[in-house]
């Protein structure tokens, strides 16, 4: 190839744009990068050319890769997090700004300006598993060094960005690409100052070498301040021009070029001011203690997380995919160790911090929160949470996530043992209760909305929800000495009130802000710790306590602030030993149980803690109903009620009760305390919490009245799950499930889980009508009819029970099938009697109590039968749920089973039913049946009308004897469930109906047949087996057709099937077949054929089928 030969190369960038360049064939790859840098807007140092999966090496020629006329891909390298300058030319080349021609707006910053971490696409479970390093103690070594070192490095990086902006301001518009920003004397001085800072370096091979870190000296701080001064001097003339432009911007008219230059100055100066402010914030907390021994070092008075809001919630909008061009800013600042040396030089913990990219870091603290800068430098600060923040660079309110991880070693005494696994030092952080598949399904929808909003697209039906800031002021100082007078905060307009052994009322206990924020925080990961506002001059001791939650097996960390005025800090071992006042089981404890047990937060342990009254700040308009209700309650309880109960010592203070269990040994509540909060308030709270948890999944249900059936159908994408004719479990239980899912919403279910029976009370008419029609089949609701219906229903469950417990190990002497059958029969009798006979206002509450009692007894009974194996019982329940949910989305079923497994473990650990109480329900192998056998002899035939069998959605009717079919009542009659004539307490007139209809010698035969059929599960005929394998909709159609008894219809159908054609017309054949003589001959032939079949059948006995001769021989 000749030296002067040209070649065409097409370069494709990540934005799908292609550019064709004509270059010399012998050009080096390095020279080619420099040639295309001005067109693509990426400096040669950041370019990476890829062709056929290979990276083009810079020292090779372009023609060696045979790219003539081909397409090569250009990607941008991620810049190193820290840059160390070794010389002037290398520094200038590594920090050259990108071309401004690549930006759509003249003068806009480069696409990766201020991005110190560049990521591609990641998903939430992977990131969650790696967040465990953020919660480790201060002993973990990090590459960035100590907190003061991180501050200085952060300031240096920010100064580099400011210098880039200044270089663009000082350079000519047409020569910006060729400008060398680091050639100035000031920049050289800046580079020399950075050489003194030991930090991570990166060589040409990409290997990072970390030097030992230490606390920086004050001289290094002085050099950074000098660099700041030089930057301010360079910025001063542009600030003057900036003010002139803004002063005349209201009414001036501009030419095109003048307008572009002025706009460019406004953009660059504004960005520089923001960066300069961040740099000042980063270094403003550095202090030097002159009273300490030399050599003296710098320390930090507060972590960076102080400058961010304590809690920002965007309805749990979790960004899952973050494309290149966004910024992930992580601030892992810990708090001071809970020890202050005598010389006053506090030792800060070793953590990592990066540049925060949120506008919230410059916002003033909310009202009611006093800046912590008022605290003395040598006082122990309040514990601050670690903050992991993901912020979108374009539209910040759309993608905002704060995950606060409590530092286990912060703020506590030095003699506290290290945290155990799952408390503060766990290696990995998981999300209990939500499987990765379900989180991924939710996250995909949220990600699409977040990304579309970031790019300016509109999503139908999506409205940006309001952003809330939940804050809590610092707890006031109380003297918690047993028997001493407790000082309560003064009420508005009142003076401070003291009373011996005062019990702090609802406004002083169980911070509502912490419960709600922890509730949503549990959805993300560990419970969220709301930041403490203000400061206290007295020494404060914080004790981290591990509390067991009610709906999750993971242990959660709750911080118990306890203030004392003595000089000795006291550490309490657990929550129950804190001699704080008892919370009456009324307003806030009920709300604590409601919110605390929903997702397993530490609210149940917070109900007995004395904290400051919460304050809730709404940052944007649009307050939902539940937050409005919370605000109303807080305003209504500003006056702290004080009771005069006798003082209680620390040893007598009972532990906080668990959420499902009622509070025991607690102080008596004030008058009418349980009635202070109406059910409507709890409904609004639950509705708001569910809306925050589900995020975009609940966007279609703004009113909170969407039924569970509609919700599941919307998630699964199928619209026939809960239809009467759809495939499903069928039968009585399928219809009952359909009724509940169509009438209950998610809010109703949560209310029922927390003891509110109003949804059941509202469902009373539908339940009564359903049980009368589907359970008793329009029979009178007498005790005997209810008992008979219960036996019929439970007998049909025998195969299901045997199949469910076939894969687990049962006690050798226990008949688990008969145990469950008789237990369910007894419970159905009780519940059905209550539903059909109770008509007062206690219907819902009593029904809920009966269902809960039955559930606990069933769990305890089967747990005993399974030898106490909880995993076996959980697998039995989950397997049944999976079989009943074949048409539901597998992701949703997996989530339901996971949540149910966690909830079941908690319930089994708090079982109120003892093993001795359920022994009466246990049935042993070989024992004589006390209830089923006599009842099987007394039980009459099932009197279900034929039209119900044809029109119902139940499974096919099992095979019955000929006698049962013959003595079914006609379709027009009202069915009754008739008892046996030998029943001592029932009417003889009703019981004589079926026995009087047959000869007396056949009564024992029928009874024996019924008993045998109920004792042994017979194999169904082939016809029933065929029907049972059909879909429910097809099976119903088949059952509804009925037999064709007309001879003419039968022959016509046979002709159509076989394709035969009559010699005469079809009408003529029909007339001949409708003749009575032909009908008689046909019937006679049919009976003769059946008689021959019966004679050849060895299993046929005339004693078992005594009416055969009357049916097929025409005998009278």
Curated annotation (Swiss-Prot):
Domain named Ubiquitin-like: residues: 7-82
Its job: ATP-independent molecular chaperone preventing the aggregation of misfolded and hydrophobic patches-containing proteins. Functions as part of a cytosolic protein quality control complex, the bag6/bat3 complex, which maintains these client proteins in a soluble state and participates in their proper delivery to the endoplasmic reticulum or alternatively can promote their sorting to the proteasome where they undergo degradation. The bag6/bat3 complex is involved in the post-translational delivery of tail-anchored/type II transmembrane proteins to the endoplasmic reticulum membrane. When nuclear, may also act as a component of some chromatin regulator complex.
Chief location category: cytoplasm
Comp. bias (Basic and acidic residues): 1068-1080
Biased composition (Pro residues): 653-672
Organism the protein comes from: Xenopus laevis
Protein name per Swiss-Prot or TrEMBL: Large proline-rich protein bag6-B
Molecular-function GO term, any one: polyubiquitin modification-dependent protein binding
Subunit structure: Component of the bag6/bat3 complex.
GO BP field: brain development; chromatin organization; endoplasmic reticulum stress-induced pre-emptive quality control; ERAD pathway; internal peptidyl-lysine acetylation; intrinsic apoptotic signaling pathway in response to DNA damage by p53 class mediator; intrinsic apoptotic signaling pathway in response to endoplasmic reticulum stress; kidney development
Low complexity compositional bias, start-end: 79-100, 208-219, 482-502, 535-580, 641-652
Subcellular location: Cytoplasm, Cytosol; Nucleus; Secreted, Extracellular exosome
Highest taxon of the lineage: Eukaryota
Polar residues compositional bias, start-end: 194-207, 344-353
Keywords carried by this UniProt record: Apoptosis, Chaperone, Chromatin regulator, Cytoplasm, Nucleus, Secreted, Transport
Annotated stretches, region: Disordered: 76-114, 170-221, 329-385, 473-502, 533-589, 640-678, 1058-1080
Lineage of source species: Eukaryota, Metazoa, Chordata, Craniata, Vertebrata
GO CC terms: BAT3 complex; cytosol; extracellular region; nucleus
């Amino acid at each position: 190839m000749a030296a002067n030969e040209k070649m065409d190369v097409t370069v494709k960038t990540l934005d799908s744009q292609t550019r064709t360049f004509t270059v010399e064939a012998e050009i080096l790859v390095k020279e080619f990068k420099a040639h295309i840098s001005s067109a693509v807007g990426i400096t040669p140092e950041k370019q990476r050319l890829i062709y056929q999966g290979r990276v083009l090496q810079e020292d090779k020629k372009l023609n060696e890769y045979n790219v003539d006329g081909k397409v090569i891909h250009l990607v941008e390298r991620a810049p190193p997090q820290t840059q160390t300058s070794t010389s002037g030319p290398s520094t200038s080349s590594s920090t050259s700004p990108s071309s401004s021609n690549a930006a759509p707006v003249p003068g806009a910053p480069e696409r990766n300006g201020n991005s110190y971490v560049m990521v591609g696409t990641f998903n939430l479970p992977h990131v969650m598993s790696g967040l465990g390093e953020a919660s480790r103690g201060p002993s973990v070594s990090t590459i960035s060094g100590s907190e003061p070192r991180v501050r200085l490095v952060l300031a240096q990086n920010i100064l580099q960005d400011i210098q880039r902006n200044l270089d663009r301001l000082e350079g000519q518009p047409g020569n910006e690409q060729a400008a060398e920003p680091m050639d100035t004397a000031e920049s050289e001085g800046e580079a020399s100052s950075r050489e003194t800072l030991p930090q991570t370096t990166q060589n040409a091979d990409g290997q990072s070498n970390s030097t030992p870190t230490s606390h920086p000296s004050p001289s290094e701080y002085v050099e950074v301040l000098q660099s700041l001064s030089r930057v301010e001097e360079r910025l001063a003339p542009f600030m003057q021009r900036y003010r002139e432009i803004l002063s005349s911007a209201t009414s001036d008219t501009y030419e095109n070029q003048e307008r572009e230059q002025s706009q460019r100055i406004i953009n660059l100066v504004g960005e520089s001011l923001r960066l300069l402010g961040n740099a000042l914030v980063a270094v403003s907390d550095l202090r030097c203690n002159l009273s300490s021994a030399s050599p003296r070092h710098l320390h930090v008075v507060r972590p960076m997380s102080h400058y961010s809001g304590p809690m920002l919630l965007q309805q749990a909008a979790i960004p899952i995919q973050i494309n290149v061009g966004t910024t992930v800013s992580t601030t892992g600042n810990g708090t001071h160790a809970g020890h202050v040396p005598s010389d006053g030089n506090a030792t800060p913990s070793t953590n990592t911090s990066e540049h925060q990219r949120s506008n919230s870091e410059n916002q003033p603290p909310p009202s009611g929160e006093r800046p912590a800068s008022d605290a003395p430098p040598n006082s122990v600060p309040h514990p601050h949470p670690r903050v992991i923040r993901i912020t979108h660079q374009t539209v910040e309110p759309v993608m905002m996530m704060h995950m606060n991880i409590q530092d286990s070693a912060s703020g506590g005494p030095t003699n506290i043992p290290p945290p155990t696994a799952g408390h503060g030092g766990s290696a990995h952080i998981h999300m209990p209760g939500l499987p990765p598949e379900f989180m991924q399904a939710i996250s995909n929808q949220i990600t699409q909305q977040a990304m579309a909003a970031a790019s300016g697209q509109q999503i139908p039906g999506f409205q940006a929800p309001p952003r809330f800031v939940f804050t809590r002021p610092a707890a006031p100082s109380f003297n918690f000495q047993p028997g001493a007078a407790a000082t309560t905060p003064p009420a508005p307009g009142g003076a401070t009130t003291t009373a011996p052994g005062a019990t702090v009322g609802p406004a002083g206990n169980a911070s509502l802000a912490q419960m709600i924020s922890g509730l949503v925080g549990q959805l993300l990961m560990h419970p969220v710790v709301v930041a403490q506002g203000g400061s206290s001059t007295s020494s404060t001791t914080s004790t981290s306590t591990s509390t067991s939650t009610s709906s999750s097996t993971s242990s959660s960390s709750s911080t118990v602030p306890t203030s004392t005025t003595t000089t000795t800090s006291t550490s309490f071992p657990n929550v129950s030993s804190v001699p704080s006042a008892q919370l009456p089981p009324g307003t806030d404890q009920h709300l604590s149980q409601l919110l605390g047990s929903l997702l397993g937060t530490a609210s149940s342990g917070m109900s007995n803690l004395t904290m400051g009254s919460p304050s809730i700040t709404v940052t944007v308009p649009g307050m939902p109903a539940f937050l409005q209700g919370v605000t109303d309650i807080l305003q209504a309880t500003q006056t702290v009620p004080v009771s005069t109960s006798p003082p209680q010592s620390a040893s007598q203070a009972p532990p906080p009760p668990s959420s499902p269990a009622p509070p025991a040994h607690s102080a008596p509540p004030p008058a009418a305390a349980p009635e202070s909060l109406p059910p409507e308030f709890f409904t609004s709270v639950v509705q708001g919490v569910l809306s925050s948890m589900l995020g975009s999944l609940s966007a279609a249900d703004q009113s909170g009245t969407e039924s569970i059936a509609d919700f599941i159908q919307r998630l699964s994408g199928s619209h026939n799950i809960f239809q009467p004719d759809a495939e499903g479990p069928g039968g009585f239980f399928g219809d009952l499930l359909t009724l509940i899912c169509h009438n209950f919403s998610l809010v109703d279910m949560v209310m029922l889980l927390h003891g509110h029976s109003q949804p059941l009370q509202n469902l009373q008419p539908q339940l009564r009508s359903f049980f009368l029609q589907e359970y008793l089949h329009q029979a009178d609701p007498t005790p005997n009819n209810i008992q008979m219906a219960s036996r019929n229903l439970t007998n049909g469950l025998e195969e299901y029970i045997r199949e469910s417990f076939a894969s687990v190990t049962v006690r050798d002497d226990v008949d688990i099938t008969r145990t469950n059958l008789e237990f369910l029969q007894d419970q159905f009798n009780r519940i059905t009697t209550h539903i059909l006979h109770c008509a007062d206002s206690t219907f819902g509450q009593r029904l809920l109590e009966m269902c809960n009692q039955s559930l606990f007894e069933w769990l305890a009974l089967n747990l005993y039968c399974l030898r106490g194996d909880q995993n076996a019982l959980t697998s039995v329940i989950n397997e049944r749920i999976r079989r009943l949910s074949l048409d539901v989305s597998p992701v949703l079923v997996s989530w339901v089973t996971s949540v149910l497994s966690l909830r079941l473990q908690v319930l089994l650990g708090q079982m109120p039913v003892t093993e001795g109480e359920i022994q009466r329900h246990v049935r042993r192998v070989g024992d004589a049946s006390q209830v089923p056998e006599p009842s099987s002899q007394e039980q009459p035939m099932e009197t279900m009308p034929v039209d119900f069998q044809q029109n119902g959605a139940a499974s096919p009717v099992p095979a019955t004897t000929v006698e049962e079919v013959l003595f079914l009542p006609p379709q027009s009659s009202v069915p009754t469930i008739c008892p046996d004539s030998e029943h001592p307490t029932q009417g003889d007139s009703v019981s004589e109906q079926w026995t009087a209809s047959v000869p007396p010698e056949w009564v024992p035969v029928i009874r024996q047949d019924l008993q045998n059929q109920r004792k042994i599960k017979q194999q169904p005929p082939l016809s029933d087996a065929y029907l049972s394998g059909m879909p429910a909709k097809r099976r119903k159609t088949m059952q509804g057709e009925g037999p064709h008894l007309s001879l003419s219809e039968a022959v016509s159908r046979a002709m159509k099937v076989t394709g035969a054609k009559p010699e005469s017309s079809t009408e003529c054949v029909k007339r001949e077949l409708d003749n009575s003589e032909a009908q008689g001959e046909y019937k006679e032939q049919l009976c003769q054929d059946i008689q021959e079949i019966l004679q050849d059948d060895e299993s046929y006995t005339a004693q078992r089928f005594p009416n055969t001769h009357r049916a097929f021989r025409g005998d009278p």
